[in-house]
Regions:
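Membrane-interacting alpha-helical segments
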Residues: 20-23, 106-111, 164
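C-terminal regulatory/oligomerization modules of transcriptional regulators
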Residues: 1-18, 68, 142, 146-164
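Hydrophobic alpha-helical core bundles mediating ligand binding, dimerization, or RNAP-core interactions
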Residues: 26-30, 34-45, 118-121, 125-136, ...
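Hydrophobic alpha-helical segments
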Residues: 45, 93-96, 134, 158, ...
Length: 164
């Protein structure tokens, strides 16, 4: 190849693509990401005969430092889901009917079946989550975490003001 051919070949090569600017973080983008990830989890939960709300309530009971009363669990789940207390009580009743939670005096405690369900869902979702979150730089995850924490704090304050 001559110098002229080399120059011609180089000048006809496509320019390197310019990366598109990162989209702005918006309420819509946050919602779409939430529902996309939640859709994956709900698909797995459905295969185990469980709902998203049941999983949240069961996880609250399992991860509690001390035995929880139904009122304790309702308050904790309401803090996460912003759901109606009556609906959360219905979820706790469903978990008792499925024998995933059991009454122990005034407290509710998770059964072995409840723990096994959560462990099975976690095992099944782990590789899916790894594919969703894998390859995202740690600094991006840290920045996203800071933004999400701030949005959560502000939205919780707005909801508290609305319902005061």
């Amino acid at each position: 190849m001559t110098t002229t051919e080399s120059t011609t070949a180089a000048s006809t090569a496509a320019p390197a693509p310019v990366p598109a600017p990162a989209p702005a973080a918006t309420a819509r983008a946050l919602g779409l990401a939430h529902y996309a990830a939640r859709g994956v989890l709900e698909y797995v939960l459905a295969r185990h005969g469980a709902t998203f709300a049941q999983q949240i309530a069961l996880r609250a009971a399992i991860n509690a430092d001390a035995p929880q009363t139904p009122d304790d669990l309702v308050a904790q789940v309401q803090g996460s889901l912003k759901a109606d207390p009556a609906g959360i009580r219905a979820v706790l009743d469903e978990l008792r009917a499925k024998e995933l939670l059991v009454a122990d005096g005034e407290h509710l405690r998770p059964t072995e079946a409840g723990r096994e369900l959560l462990a099975a869902v976690a095992a099944e979702t782990a590789p899916l989550s790894a594919r969703v979150w894998g390859g995202i730089p740690a600094e991006d995850l840290a920045a996203a975490g800071r933004v999400l924490a701030l949005v959560t704090e502000r939205a919780d304050a707005e909801l508290a003001a609305l319902t005061a």
